[in-house]
Amino acid sequence: MNLEIIAQLTVLALIIASGPLVIALLAARKGNL
């Protein structure tokens, strides 16, 4: 596999994983407020 493909896969994985994390952070902040 090329480094470019690995880089793109890692970026996609981070974006997909960041979605639920952002929602969880927003929910936690709303709960604290």
Curated annotation (Swiss-Prot):
GO terms for biological process: photosynthesis. The chain crosses the membrane at residues 5-25. Its main location: plastid. Pfam families: PSII_Ycf12. It is found in: Plastid, Chloroplast thylakoid membrane. Keywords: Chloroplast, Membrane, Photosynthesis, Photosystem II, Plastid, Thylakoid, Transmembrane, Transmembrane helix. InterPro entries: PSII_Ycf12_core-subunit. One of its GO terms (cellular component) is photosystem II. It is a single-pass membrane protein. The keyword NADP does not apply. NCBIfam families: PRK13686.1. A core subunit of photosystem II (PSII), probably helps stabilize the reaction center. PSII is composed of 1 copy each of membrane proteins PsbA, PsbB, PsbC, PsbD, PsbE, PsbF, PsbH, PsbI, PsbJ, PsbK, PsbL, PsbM, PsbT, PsbX, PsbY, PsbZ, Psb30/Ycf12, peripheral proteins of the oxygen-evolving complex and a large number of cofactors. It forms dimeric complexes. Belongs to the Psb30/Ycf12 family. This is Photosystem II reaction center protein Psb30.
